[in-house]
From Swiss-Prot:
GO terms for molecular function: preprotein binding; unfolded protein binding. Its main location: cytoplasm. The gene is secB. NCBIfam families: PRK05751.1-1 (NF004390), PRK05751.1-4 (NF004393), secB (TIGR00809). GO terms for cellular component: cytosol. The lineage of its organism: Bacteria, Pseudomonadati, Pseudomonadota, Gammaproteobacteria, Enterobacterales. Keywords: Chaperone, Cytoplasm, Protein transport, Translocation, Transport. Belongs to the SecB family. One of the proteins required for the normal export of some preproteins out of the cell cytoplasm. It is a molecular chaperone that binds to a subset of precursor proteins, maintaining them in a translocation-competent state. For 2 proteins (MBP, MalE and PhoA) the substrate is wrapped around the homotetramer, which prevents it from folding. It also specifically binds to its receptor SecA. Its substrates include DegP, FhuA, FkpA, GBP, LamB, MalE (MBP), OmpA, OmpF, OmpT, OmpX, OppA, PhoE, TolB, TolC, YbgF, YcgK, YgiW and YncE. Disruption phenotype: Growth continues, but export of its substrates is blocked. Expression of chaperones DnaK, GroEL/ES, ClpB, and HslU increases. This is Protein-export protein SecB. Gene3D superfamilies: SecB-like.
């Protein structure tokens, strides 16, 4: 028991890498002749898996779609991966680490990759605002708690 109480939390980044990237401009070149007033949609998703004892892969998927009216100007997707050594935490703390802390580390890399691809597609510069993954994680926990409550009420 005393060994468990003395276990310190350890966190180390082993590797950050681009797992998958995609850029499509399905309506080029005529989309370049239109007034550039796009509607930009940002979708985020995270996934994690345990690779070994205390070693986890976290993948942040960022998808940006820019539309002009009904036409898609571009669609850009990045899957930014990271391998992390994490020990000394469990349960909700581990879920927060994998679902919020690690994505916070990965997002700047994904954002830079998206900015580069959009620029190479000769579209105007796209600056993605920082994302509060802690707030997104808390919303996720609240949704999960709400769904659990609804299930108990139905029973």
């Amino acid at each position: 028991m005393s060994e468990q109480n003395n276990t310190e939390m350890t966190f180390q980044i082993q590797r950050i890498y681009t797992k998958d990237i995609s850029f499509e401009a399905p309506n080029a070149p005529h989309v370049f002749q239109k007034d550039w007033q796009p509607e930009v949609k940002l979708d985020l998703d995270t996934a994690s898996s345990q690779l070994a004892d205390d070693v986890y892969e976290v993948v942040l998927r960022v998808t940006v779609t820019a539309s002009l009216g009904e036409e898609t100007a571009f669609l850009c997707e990045v899957q930014q991966g990271g391998i992390f050594s994490i020990a000394g935490i469990e349960g909700t703390q581990m879920a927060h680490c994998l679902g919020a802390y690690c994505p916070n580390i990965l997002f700047p890399y994904a954002r830079e990759c998206i900015t580069s691809m959009v620029s190479r597609g000769t579209f105007p510069q796209l600056n993605l605002a920082p994302v509060n993954f802690d707030a997104l994680f808390m919303n996720y926990l609240q949704q999960q708690a709400g769904e659990g409550t609804e299930e108990h009420q139905d029973a």
